[in-house]
Structure formats: C-alpha cells, structure tokens
Design a protein with these regions (language model features):
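Electrostatic cytochrome c docking/interface patches
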Residues: 19-38, 57
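Phosphate-coordinating loops and pocket residues in cytosolic domains that bind phosphorylated ligands
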Residues: 38-39, 47, 61, 89
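Sec-dependent bacterial lipoprotein signal peptides
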Residues: 1-25
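Glycine-centered loop/turn positions within well-structured domains
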Residues: 40-43, 57, 69, 85
Length: 107
C-alpha cells in the first residue's frame, strides 16, 4: 500500500513539474514573439490589441480566423497565398522565431 502512495505522489509531482515547465516555456515563447513582432517590423504595418501600425490589417484576432500553418506560410511568403499582398517576405526568420510570433498572436 505504501508503494502505491509513493508511486501516486511521484506521478502527481511529475505532472506538476511538467506542466510548470511547459507553462514557463510557453510564456517565454510568447514574450520572445512579442519582442520579435516589434523588432522585426511587423508592428510598423500591423497593430495588435491597439499597438502598432495601421497600414496592414489588425492581427488581434488573426489566430481565430487562420490556422498556425496558414499564418506561418503567409509570414514566409505572402504572395504565395495572395499574389496582391503588399507584405514583404519574412523567410529570413527561423522556424522558432515564426512560431514565437504566432504564439504571441494567440495571446
């Protein structure tokens, strides 16, 4: 019986640690995405929750309308999706940087 209690306690502790690490890494990714949104120039054209430019569309609800993979493809090469897009390609951004920006947009 004591062995079961130890195993159960271990599983609970592992779950708490895993969820905390996952939460912290998610917060870090969102923070990095916010920094990238402003440092890479996204905010010069796009606004997000009232901050940023007005030339491009407001991105506050973009993750409700488009999938992560669609947003990622659009960041890489907008004219592949919309030949009339005025947004430049951001294909120089690494996969992890694009994911961080998308995580920020989900905030």
């Amino acid at each position: 019986m004591l062995g079961l209690k130890k195993s159960f306690c271990f599983l609970i502790a592992a779950a708490i640690i895993f969820s905390t690490v996952h939460f912290i890494s998610g917060c870090a990714m969102t923070y990095n995405g916010e920094m990238l949104f402003f440092s890479e120039g996204c905010s010069q054209c796009h606004s997000f929750k009232g901050k940023g430019g007005r030339m491009g569309p407001d991105l506050s609800a973009v993750t409700n309308l488009r999938s992560d993979s669609w947003i990622d493809r659009y960041i890489i090469n907008p004219t592949d999706i919309n030949p009339l897009a005025r947004m430049p390609s951001f294909n120089h951004l690494s996969n992890s940087k694009r994911k961080a920006i998308i995580a920020f947009l989900k905030k």
